[in-house]
Swiss-Prot record:
It catalyses: L-homoserine + ATP = O-phospho-L-homoserine + ADP + H(+). It comes from the Bacteria. Catalyzes the ATP-dependent phosphorylation of L-homoserine to L-homoserine phosphate. Belongs to the GHMP kinase family. Homoserine kinase subfamily. This is Homoserine kinase. SUPFAM superfamilies: GHMP Kinase, C-terminal domain, Ribosomal protein S5 domain 2-like. InterPro entries: GHMP_kinase_C_dom, GHMP_kinase_C_sf, GHMP_kinase_N_dom, GHMP_knse_ATP-bd_CS, Homoserine_kinase, Ribosomal_Su5_D2-typ_SF, Ribsml_uS5_D2-typ_fold_subgr. Pfam families: GHMP_kinases_C, GHMP_kinases_N.
Amino acid sequence: MLRIYAPASSANISVGFDTLGVAVSPIDGSLLGDVVQIEEIEQGFELESAGYFVRKLPKEPQKNIVYQAYVLFSERLKLRNLKIKPLRLTLEKNMPIGSGLGSSACSIVAALVALNQFYQQPFSKMELLEMMGELEGRISGSIHYDNVAPCYLGGVQLMVQSLGNICQQLPFFDNWYWVLAYPGIEVSTAEARAILPKSYTRQDVISHGRHLGSFVHACHTRQEALAAYMMRDVIAEPYREALLPNFAEVKQAVKDLGVLASGISGSGPTMFAIAPDLAIATKSATYLENNYLQNNEGFVHICKVDNVGARALV
């Protein structure tokens, strides 16, 4: 029996719409992500589900993304003339759906990594990542890797999608604390994409390029202040903030508390705030608990970058 954990991820990081993503893990050691267990059985295929958010999963197994991952993986095995083994997959759904924390990516990554290890790794990392992107595209309507790549590989990933590489890891600031606040409401990726304009002004395009280029440069040259300053979003946040509860007010409040940068995690409704030290992270977390959470399903975690990505649990 094998258990694979895939961590939460925050896509875009404000400055890199559909091109940047970071894997995160709580500093208290709790697992913020999904777990998929795989084991051999006598015949056929079985899919079971458990976990706090299991009630949010589709009632029909065929609509479960883990089932779709199994089907896609099996199709790729057949193309290599490899025998399909009888097995059972169990998804522990610990991530809220439509949270902006890469919930679907967690399930996809955990399932495909479990299957690849179960079959003695017939597929390379890039081949597996390509499958992950295809499955993610079925949910959001377009193939993008800014959740699955960091969830799978860890760290901060920049999507390059050229010269045989889907992504490359950016050097980052491990001393930063990431405060993630999920308000307990759901925003679908499709809904969050539909609210965006079909075109942007020349000035917005120039600003976006300047911010992203400067951010990547700052990461490579270890300029924390410049990197944090450039974490600005002219592509999505001005339009998506309407989907989030009192976002502008909360963003200003955590800035006043001393955070370096804040924004929408993925397509929302989770927001992130980056703190330079634990004291400011703790103050920000307390504020967000009291002012951003909307119900009992909401939560706040103080995290750091997860540089490992998907991994087996002992």
